[in-house]
Every structure is written in structure tokens, then in C-alpha cells.
Amino acid sequence: VRVGFLHSLIRKEEKLLLDALAKRREVEVVMLDDRKMVFDLRSGPEVDVVLERCINHSRALHGLRLLENRGIRCVNSYAVANVCGDKLLTSLALEEAGVPQPEVRIAFTEASALVALDDIGYPAVLKPAVGSWGRLLSKVNDRDAAESILEHKTILGSYHHSIFYIQEYVEKHGRDIRSFVVGDECVAAIYRDSAHWITNTARGARASNCPVTAEVAAISLAAARAVGGGILAVDLFETPRGLLVNEVNYTMEFRNSIDTTGVDIPGRMVEHLVEGGQ
């Protein structure tokens, strides 16, 4: 099996995945560096399957589309990357599938965003539709803060900042859950604890093992199916209404979760990739 490894910088996760691939005698790895590749619309690399591990969302998205156009199976697929890379599209997919999530409003102007914030109630969370690692999130506590943040986003922001994705603020009491879905199984989960309202390990949150209960597995698999399935990380909030899906990530990071959970996450990913799962 010739596995194309679509990547940018080789981080800890990529090293772990390459180590797991190297243990498979039937696998030949073909490195596809998105900083060096030149794509041809009429031909593609001689590989059977591609594992996408790009850092840049736009490169991942366009690279996957070009590779799939040549008939190459990609994990995750272009369709999944397209949905997961955009919080609005993710929210729509979850809504269509009936998967519980926090309340969301979308607005395109400062004036309509203020109406949306009044509707959803303060505090609320303002997010860029496209973004990762908990960056450029704003907890908006009142109308004065909202007016200031919206003006800054409108004047200083790119096109993406003119789409106002407004989410209900969920009181997490210092922690949330990240679960890991590989194909049809929720293989592991962690708690992420932080004194800050953004509980992201990239921003210093502490990881500890979270048991994969029937409830965690069910909502994680439902969220994964809603966006198209594959190898995905699902961020969950614990609330009095039950678990809610915050986000679904398609190029998942797991370096802090292997020892924490005792699960060989890269090994499970490679098994799924090589044995034909989508």
C-alpha cells in the first residue's frame, strides 16, 4: 500500500504517525510536502491513499480536492475538511443531523450582529467562522464590549471577520471534553481543564483521561457522522441539558492524549487508513 503523507511542518503528531506507518511492512510512505508540491490537473502522485496532515486549512482543502480529482482516496476527505474547517457549515451539519449543540446565530453586519447578541443573550462568544487553536475568540460580556469588538473586526479584519458567528456562552466550570473518533469507534477521550474560559491544550489547558461512556461515544459518533465521518476530534461541553458538541476537528492533534488515555491513537489512525476505512 502506497500511502501519501500530505504535510507541512513535521510536528510531534506527524512523527508519531510516521512511526506507526513504519511498523506496517506492507506500507510504503510517499511524503507530499505542501510547501514543495506542484499539482497537475491531469495527473497526481502514484499513491493508493492520502493521509492529510497540513497545518494550513486552505492548503489542506485545495490539496484534498486536487488529489480526489485524480481518484485518490483521502483521509479525511475534501467534503469533511470543508465542513469541519468552517464553524458555520459544522453547525448546519449538526443541526441537520439533530446533534445537540450550543445556540448559534449568524450575522453579516455590525447592526445585525448586535441584534443577534441581544437575542442569544450576554455573555456570548464571538468566533471567526474559520480558525483554530482557540485563536481570535471573544467572550462578549455586554453591549458596550460587543460594539467595540464588532467595530474592530469590521475595520481590521479580513473577509472572514465580516461573517459574525455568535455562540451561546456555556459555563463549563473550567473543563470540557475532547473525544477521538476513528471510523466507527470513539477510541479515547480527555478532559481539558483550565482556569481560562478557553480550554484548549494549545493554550495551556491540562489533559486528563475521560472515560468513554455510552453518552460520550454516542454523541461523538453522531457528530462525526454528521460531518461525513473519518478520523475526527470532537469537542464537547458538559451541561445540565446533557453533552453539547462545540466543534469537530479534521486534522486532529493528539500528542497530549496518548499517555493520558493509554490508547495508541496514531496506531488506530494508521490501522483505519491502511485497512480501507474512509
Language-model regions: role of each:
Residues 138-227:
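Phosphate-binding site of ATP-dependent enzymes
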Residues 124, 165, 187-188, 232, ...:
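Protein kinase-like catalytic core scaffold
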Residues 167-168, 229-240:
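A short glycine-rich, hydrophobically flanked beta-strand micro-motif that places a catalytic Asp/Glu
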Residues 1-3, 7, 68-71, 81-165, ...:
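Active-site nucleotide/adenylate-binding loops and adjacent lid/helix of ATP-dependent enzymes
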Residues 225, 238-278:
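C-terminal active-site "lid" helix and adjoining low-complexity regulatory extension at the edge
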Residues 1-80, 84, 89, 274:
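ATP-binding N-terminal substructure of ATP-dependent carboxylate-amine bond-forming enzymes
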Residues 28-29, 73-74, 101, 124, ...:
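Hydrophobic beta-strand scaffold residues
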Residues 55-57, 130-131, 251:
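Short glycine-rich anion-binding loops that position phosphate/pyrophosphate groups of nucleotides
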